[in-house]
Regions:
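Single-stranded nucleic acid-binding surfaces, predominantly the OB-fold ssDNA-binding core
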Residues: 1-92
Length: 92
């Protein structure tokens, strides 16, 4: 899903262990994205990984983002994960 979103909030970047990363750690942050149109539009809490996690976005920035949705089951509960594949700020 590639779409235009408004940035609602972004967490600080932190590092988590990863066997797939060269240095054994991967950068990660969470971002809240909202579809344009008003305060009651759909919002998504997504994870940004790797180098893109170091890019800072301000509240109300307009961005184009490609999101990947997946689900997983853990202890009988089903969880949805949303990962940002790519994200670009739209210049005003």
């Amino acid at each position: 899903m590639k779409q235009i979103f408004k940035v609602v909030a972004q967490s600080d970047t932190f590092h988590v262990p990863s066997q797939k990363a060269e240095g054994g750690q991967i950068s990660k942050c969470n971002i809240v994205l909202q579809e344009p149109g008003g305060k009651y539009e759909n919002s998504y809490v997504a994870t940004i990984l790797d180098e893109q996690a170091n890019i800072r976005f301000a509240k109300d920035d307009l961005v184009v983002a490609a999101l990947r949705f997946s689900t997983r089951e853990y202890n009988g509960q089903v969880y949805q994960d949303i990962v940002v594949n790519e994200i670009f700020k739209i210049k005003n």
